[in-house]
Amino acid sequence: MGKNLTKEDLKPIERNSPLMQKARKYGWLTKLPIIKQVFRKKHHPRGYDVEAAQILPMNFKVGDYESEVIPLKLMDHFIDKAGTIVLVQCPCRVTAGCKNHNIDLGCVWMGNGAANLDLEKLPGGSKGRIATKEEAKEHARAALKDGLVPALGKLRGDAVAYNVLDYEDEFMNFCFCCNCCCVVAGMKYGNSDYKRHIKRMKGVTVTTDPEKCIGCGECFKVCIYNGLKLEKGKSVHTKDCIGCGHCVEVCPQDAIALNFDENSDIDEVVDEIIERFEKIVDISG
């Protein structure tokens, strides 16, 4: 092992905002059965089948898409279908004062909900603007180039935060997450409901080669989803790993690999994601 790692070495470099401090301090309360039920009634009154979120591995190429990363195929599909597109600065990075990534490479909101956003009152004081499909596609490519992880979401919480709850089923987005500021890092402190929608892409696995791993701890610094543990001085991915790819990008030994199940069909996986979202959201407005 490269060094004797301490608990501090294994802590992710995540935002230390008042909201995250609150999540760390009080998140455990949401695991109590009675509070969990109250949480569900308040935040998911229509159940979970009308919401969805999907993490997409950054810069992931496989099968027939060796020349095109999978996230772009999905993003281009939905951007082409969107009637309205609004580009918004990342509220996570704006409120955290991010120094590592461009705050302008934020969310791509789509649909009639996006058309009804109050651009003067966006979360976190972010700024936004109406964009063309071409601008949205350029934005997505710039975000991937900047090392941000794309995530597709249709969530009630977003509609509430952006004050467009009346358009909940006509409002979805791509957000581009950094390991230092993403508010989703707080989900590991709360109950299992927080993780219900944040899924690893089907067929994707992330593995560490123990022969190459020197136990430097660099991967732990960028894993904000509690997806790693230490075993015999080596990093091991847990069931909570969402397959984002941050750890792959930072490993100095190239010991971590993002893999796709050879028995799975990437076209079917992509089509399943598209179908899952198109069943619950219409962004043509």
Model-predicted regions and their roles:
Residues 189-190:
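Intrinsically disordered, low-complexity Ser/Thr/Pro/Gly-rich regulatory segments
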Residues 126-159, 165-166, 172-181:
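Compact structured core domains
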